[in-house]
């Protein structure tokens, strides 16, 4: 799971009780904490089946995502564009940022259930020591996913096939 070092600012309590008022940076940190919990829970549940869970922070990467988010704020976009040459000098390229994901996916003998930063084991929040929270998050996620399924998957596939052939 691609996470972020921003998970360090999040709390387990916030995983189940959203902050009021809503703050996108707090929500971002909470989502990254949840991703790491999920990776570690996958490791606990499926290691005996040779499935490994990894979480990682790829590093700070120069991409155009900030520019797209600032499209409706011209003065902030101009400021971002002004600082872009400096950002390009200090931030990783997308190719460099991908290296930690590649390492976790392909390194023989790498032990799952770890958090990596820039191709090395990283230090994660002590909140991640709480395995009961990880199990609760797993259960809550299963509940949410099952609530989205309104009919059996085999029925959905047949229905989708009928709809697709009707449009041909």
Would you name each region that the model predicts?
Residues 39-43, 102, 138, 142:
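Non-transmembrane alpha-helical segments in soluble domains
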Residues 110-168:
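C-terminal helix-and-tail extensions that cap enzymatic domains
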Residues 15-22, 75-83, 119-122:
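Short glycine/proline- and charge-enriched loop/turn segments
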Residues 31, 55, 81-124, 131-133:
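C-terminal helical subdomain
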Residues 60, 70-95, 151:
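Terminal hydrophobic/aromatic helix or amphipathic segment near a protein terminus
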Residues 7-8, 96-99, 144:
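Short linear elements at protein peripheries
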Residues 1-72, 146-160, 166-167:
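Rossmann-fold NAD(P)H-dependent dehydrogenase/reductase core
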């Amino acid at each position: 799971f691609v996470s972020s070092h921003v998970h360090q600012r999040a709390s387990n309590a916030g995983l189940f009780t959203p902050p009021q008022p809503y703050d996108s940076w707090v929500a971002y940190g909470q989502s990254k904490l949840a991703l790491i919990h999920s990776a570690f829970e996958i490791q606990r549940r499926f290691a005996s089946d040779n499935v490994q869970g990894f979480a990682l922070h790829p590093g700070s990467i120069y991409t155009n995502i900030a520019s797209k988010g600032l499209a409706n704020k011209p003065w902030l976009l101009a400021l971002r564009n002004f600082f872009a040459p400096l950002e390009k000098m200090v931030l990783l390229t997308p190719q460099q940022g991908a290296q930690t994901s590649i390492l976790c996916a392909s390194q023989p003998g790498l032990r799952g259930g770890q958090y990596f930063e820039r191709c090395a084991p990283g230090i994660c929040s002590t909140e991640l020591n709480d395995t009961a929270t990880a199990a609760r998050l797993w259960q809550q996620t299963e509940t949410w996913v099952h609530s989205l399924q309104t009919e059996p998957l085999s029925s959905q596939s047949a229905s989708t096939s009928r709809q697709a052939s009707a449009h041909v």
